[in-house]
């Protein structure tokens, strides 16, 4: 089966991420201590590993056998996230899903508890492409997640 080069060679563990030691250390420490925030914003120029770190983080917070804050890469959850069969980790491309209805759909999904994982993780790639109304809806969603009891196992 064909796989794009960036998918084939994308780092799968924090230790494989290059030139991001500070953020990798902070994320590992949060995972190891069990103090995971409800929202993270990764910024930087193209190709610096923002999406890669988000995907590794999604695996690490849900991994059944984490090792020093890294995902094991072998458990059912890690393999399921890698092959896309785990529905609790969702990657949304905001460049093509940039409307307020897309964010409202995301907000509605956060009301449900995770089905297979410890956390539901939403990775919004290219978030700067959201419309103004969609971004406002996202901010409202983040505030609801922060104060709402049923959605405390959600990370955006």
Name each model feature, range by range:
Residues 2-3, 32-33, 37-84:
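Walker A/P-loop
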Residues 56, 105, 137-140:
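Alpha-helical transmission elements in cytosolic ATPase-linked domains
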Residues 145-156:
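Single conserved hydrophobic/aromatic residue that forms the stacking wall/gate
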Residues 35-37, 68-71, 82-87, 115-118, ...:
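Short loop/turn elements that form and flank the Walker-type P-loop nucleotide-binding site
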Residues 17, 27, 42, 51, ...:
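Conserved RecA-like P-loop NTPase ATPase core
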Residues 23, 71, 85, 99-102, ...:
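Helical "lid/switch" subdomain of P-loop NTPase nucleotide-binding domains
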Residues 2-39, 43-45, 108-113:
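Pre-Walker A (pre-P-loop) alpha-helix and adjacent loop at the N terminus of AAA/AAA+ ATPase modules
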